[in-house]
Amino acid sequence: MRGHEPRSSSSCAACKLLKRRCTPTCIFAPYFRSSDLITFAKVHKVFGASNVSKLLGEVPEEQRQETVNSLAYEAEVRLKDPVYGCIGAIASLQKKMLELQHDLAVARTRLLAHSGVNNSQVSPLDDSPELAAFLDLVPYSDLMLLDGSTNLDAYLYDLGQPPFV
């Protein structure tokens, strides 16, 4: 998807797929070149050509390329994960981030314990000031999680479960 490049005489991907004549005013042509047939097929399957046409008509022209890029990405993810789509990918990344922050905090704490440095002198979370500030408020052993437990591993596992939609 390259935007507003001069068109060749061939039809755009949308008109090819929909088996219609591509006109000079085709709203799909600048965004779905004839070589983007698979991309348009995915967008059409998930959103429908009529809905995409209406959406592109409502979006300012300078934002249409980004709109098409977003639709193509969302269609791709929705076809891979029909139930959760992008939300499932976001939840998975958030879970991974929490696991890595936890692992980093544990590793730094162990490193400090083995180095003989007093824990009050150095924070194991120097690179994560937001998390460090939160954990400094409450001792780790007394940390109450959102689900009411103190078991961080179980909590991280629960975060990894797909969200209820």
Curated annotation (Swiss-Prot):
Any matching Pfam family: LOB
Recorded coiled-coil stretches: none
LOB domain: residues covered: 10-111
Matching InterPro entries: LOB
Family per similarity comment: Belongs to the LOB domain-containing protein family.
Protein name, per record: LOB domain-containing protein 21
Record organism: Arabidopsis thaliana (Mouse-ear cress)
Chain's gene name: LBD21
